[in-house]
Amino acid sequence: IKRFDRDQIKTNNQLKTILNEFNKGEIDILVGTQMLSKGHDYHNVRLAVVLGIDSILNMNSYKAREKALSLLIQISGRSGRKGEGEVIIQTKNEGFFNHYLNESNYKEFLESELEFRQELYPPFLKMAKVTFSHANGIKIKDEMDYFVKLLKDNKNIEVVGFGQSPIFKMANKYRYEILLRSSNIKAL
């Protein structure tokens, strides 16, 4: 059993070594992050198990459904390339994944995504995220609030949301963000 993530694999040589060991059968099980799904060549994968896909599906992003489904399609493509393969998915959204994966309805998914995005999201409207970061949490929040007020007065820009970033503190700095939308890229 080997870990396959960015904490464990820091160089291209480490990556090649683990892939070679796995492809030779010296490693039976790889446990890792999304990094496992990214374009690496694995032989003889007969089982892929996906845990926590709902955290991607439930992200606060208009791209969440697309990211989750795309990741599962990538992972599914790893299993059974040379022979039989199986994919087990842990999810509370079985209907969504069954419909678009088992019934090969990816084209239908793309059409429904375009329809969903048509009124509010790219590629039909433009979006931007402004991130504020500073060691002084009060100062940076006040700065974000100041810009929110300015931006709300701009008739060409809609302030979709603002507040603490999902990862509120990083590298000893507090983080806030503003999400903006406009039909005019220059306004953003």
Feature map (PLM): residue ranges:
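Short, conserved loop/turn and helix-capping segments at secondary-structure boundaries
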Residues: 62-69
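Accessory helical-bundle/CTD segments and flexible terminal tails appended to RecA-like ATPase motors
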Residues: 1-3, 11-62, 74-188
